[in-house]
């Protein structure tokens, strides 16, 4: 539909998938085999009084679709520290719950262009990357929260707030938000942390400034640390993926545009192993 701004797809089966349409507040249900529409799930009644609701990244667990909800004003910004999701039953395609947390001091659940901003670990705990206000509005904060296995509420006792969590090895000490995140295993996630203080023009020209630095996140210990030897990228060249036992980072930095590898076991950084023109914004390996 016009103005839909489709951003994320999750597949329930060969006959049913969901696409979030952030521009019109709808999750569309469709058949991914025949590519025919099944239904629209309208979420606009979940909007706040001063914002519109934009469904973003999604994940399915135990027959329930969890949809990150971005509440945005006319400037595409949140107005309060609410973490919100919609929970939809995959069998009926009905909204069963509007999940809201107002106590953890975070907002903007999931990033629409980053499917990894909502993920599940080996324990089937769901983790959500909250973008906050992209670092533009003090007090509207970014970080990570979770929904534990067996629960449909945001865990009130677990969070990583970036305004309160010092990033080990980061010269500016604190990150504004996690631009993209990739869960590996054993409670370890890899991300690009955005800190506008890394570039003198960070806030003046946020789309091309060098403000994104690779970090490793220990979800169990709730720590964030810079990966030593990695370059600082602009916010467009921030791919993260895995190839065999290596974590692969796309980076558009002062020295090169290309892909770098990080070995979690040896901590070795190599690269660029491949150089590209433009911004290395996506990576996928077909190796098991």
Pin down the residues of each PLM region:
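Surface-exposed loop and turn segments in beta-propeller and other repeat-based domains
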Residues: 1, 40-51, 95-113, 153-176, ...
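Structural signature of eukaryotic scaffold interfaces centered on beta-propeller domains
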Residues: 8-12, 54-61, 114-123, 174-186, ...
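Entry beta-strands of beta-propeller and related beta-repeat scaffolds
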Residues: 16-17, 64-67, 124-128, 187-191, ...
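Beta-propeller blade signature
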Residues: 31, 79-93, 140-152, 207-219, ...
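Solenoidal tandem-repeat scaffolds enriched in leucines and small polar residues
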Residues: 46-109, 113, 122
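Short, conserved, GDST-rich strand-edge loop motifs in beta-rich repeat architectures
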Residues: 67-82, 127-143, 191-209
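Loop/turn-rich, solvent-exposed surfaces of beta-rich toroidal or solenoidal domains
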Residues: 174-251
């Amino acid at each position: 539909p016009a103005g839909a701004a489709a951003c994320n797809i999750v597949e329930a089966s060969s006959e049913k998938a969901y696409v979030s349409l952030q521009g019109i507040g709808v999750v569309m249900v469709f058949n991914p085999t025949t590519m025919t529409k099944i239904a629209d799930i309208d979420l606009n009644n979940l909007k706040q009084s001063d914002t519109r609701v934009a469904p973003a990244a999604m994940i399915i667990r135990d027959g329930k679709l969890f949809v990150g909800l971005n509440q945005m004003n006319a400037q595409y910004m949140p107005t309060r520290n609410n973490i919100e999701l919609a929970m939809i039953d995959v069998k009926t395609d009905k909204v069963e719950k509007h999940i809201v947390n107002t106590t953890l001091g975070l907002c903007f659940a999931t990033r629409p262009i980053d499917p990894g901003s909502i993920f599940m670990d080996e324990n089937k705990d769901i983790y959500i990357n909250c973008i906050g206000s992209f670092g533009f509005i003090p007090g509207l904060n970014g970080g990570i929260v979770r929904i534990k296995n067996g629960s449909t509420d945001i865990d009130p006792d677990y969070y990583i707030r970036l305004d309160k969590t010092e990033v080990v090895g980061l010269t500016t000490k604190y990150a504004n938000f996690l631009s993209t995140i990739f869960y590996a295993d054993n409670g370890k996630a890899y991300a690009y942390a955005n800190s506008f203080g890394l570039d003198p023009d960070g806030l003046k020209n946020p789309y091309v400034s060098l403000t994104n630095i690779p970090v490793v996140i220990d979800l169990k210990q709730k720590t964030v640390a810079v990966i030593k030897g990695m370059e600082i990228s602009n916010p467009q060249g921030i791919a993260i993926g895995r190839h065999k036992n290596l974590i692969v980072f796309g980076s558009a930095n002062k020295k090169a545009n290309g892909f770098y590898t990080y070995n979690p076991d040896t901590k070795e950084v190599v690269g660029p192993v491949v150089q590209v023109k433009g911004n290395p914004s996506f990576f996928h390996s077909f190796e098991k």
